[in-house]
Design a protein with these regions (language model features):
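Short, conserved beta-strand segments within well-ordered enzyme catalytic domains
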Residues: 23, 69-71
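Short histidine/acidic/glycine/proline-rich micro-motifs that form metal-
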Residues: 29, 76-78, 111
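Core structural elements
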Residues: 62-69
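Short, flexible active-site-proximal loops enriched in glycine and acidic residues
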Residues: 57-59, 97-107
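Helix-adjacent hinge/juxtasegments
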Residues: 72-100
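Terminal interaction module
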Residues: 5, 103-163
């Protein structure tokens, strides 16, 4: 994890590389108060998040003050749909509590001039086509599905991404 990561739950290093992963991009940076709210609610969520009657070995990260990543290591079991639904419901609740967009999958993030910028996907495609955004610009892939993908494909230049 990076130096600007806040962690709740199981340490990231103890989560298996095949663990399920979801990354949510915030429409704006989190304030210190919002970070505290996220941590508080994440602790409660992780303590009761279960799949097939067993508590999920979960790790919750606030990354670069703009992203929330959830990792779920079910230790060989498949994660039940109800557990996945609970994580989505939790993120929708956080969105309401924080007053930020987290569930908008058409919102993408890039790094420009040492700042993370979020913009609609179609706008980014247009800026790439017009060369307003270089293909060497760092892109944050919100479509990863495992810890392994997170480690290899979450942060990468646009020209090496699915864009």
């Amino acid at each position: 994890m990076t130096e600007s990561t806040i962690q709740v739950g199981v340490p990231f290093t103890e989560i298996d590389n095949e663990a399920k992963a979801w990354v949510y991009t915030s429409s704006k940076d989190f304030t210190k108060v919002q970070q505290g709210e996220i941590k508080k609610h994440a602790q409660v969520f992780l303590a009761s998040w279960d799949s097939h009657g067993k508590i999920v070995k979960g790790s919750f990260q606030i990354i670069k003050n703009r992203f929330i990543a959830i990792f779920a290591d079910t230790e060989g079991d498949t994660m039940c749909g109800r557990a996945q639904d609970r994580s989505v419901k939790f993120m929708k609740e956080l969105e309401q509590i924080l007053g930020v967009k987290l569930m908008d999958r058409m919102l993408v993030a890039i790094q420009q001039n040492d700042q993370i910028v979020t913009l609609p996907f179609v706008e980014l495609r247009s800026k790439i086509a017009s060369k307003d955004v270089s293909t060497l610009t760092l892109f944050y892939n919100g479509l990863i599905t495992s810890k392994k993908e997170f480690l290899s494909d979450w942060e990468r230049p646009i020209d090496g991404s699915w864009l």
